[in-house]
Amino acid sequence: LKADLPENIVEDIAMAVVLMGETPEVKNWTVYLVNLKNEPLTNVLISSKGYGEKDGKQVKTSVLRHFIGDMEANSFAGVEAIDPEVFGLTNEYWLSYYIGSTIYDKKFIFLPESIIDSNLIKIPLVNKPGVMIK
């Protein structure tokens, strides 16, 4: 049955963990969805969770669901603030959205320790430093 479904490829969509600001004591990070398409997205839904090993124990964060709604072409939307304490975990964002009547979905996975200064780039549209998966 699943073989009968078309493979809807997600392109020109990115998830980014963006450095919003910093003081000597703390860095503030926010996760953004970036729509690099020239068309709008509707019914955008993202579930997020973290999992992995911390201090020798398996840990999981709560699964959070974020309804973004509709996004204009070439736009971005904040998903959630993210605590640097979870950068040592695998952070997974499962995105689903519609273009017209066609549904698309994709998992974006930030591996442990991938959100580091040496991986920062300028995130398109947001125009701030961050780590992006496309």
Predicted segments — roles?
Residues 1-15:
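A general sequence property marking short-to-moderate contiguous segments
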Residues 2-6, 80-134:
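Terminal connector regions
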Residues 8-10, 24-27, 39:
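Short, surface-exposed loop/turn motifs at beta-strand boundaries within globular domains
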Residues 17-24:
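Short, solvent-exposed beta-strand/turn "edge" segments of beta-rich domains on protein surfaces
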Residues 29-35:
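Short, well-ordered beta-strand segments enriched in hydrophobic/aromatic residues
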Residues 38-55:
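Short acidic, flexible loop segments centered on an aromatic residue
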Residues 54-90, 100-103:
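Intrinsically disordered, low-complexity Pro/Gly/Ser/Thr-rich segments with frequent PxxP/GP/PP motifs
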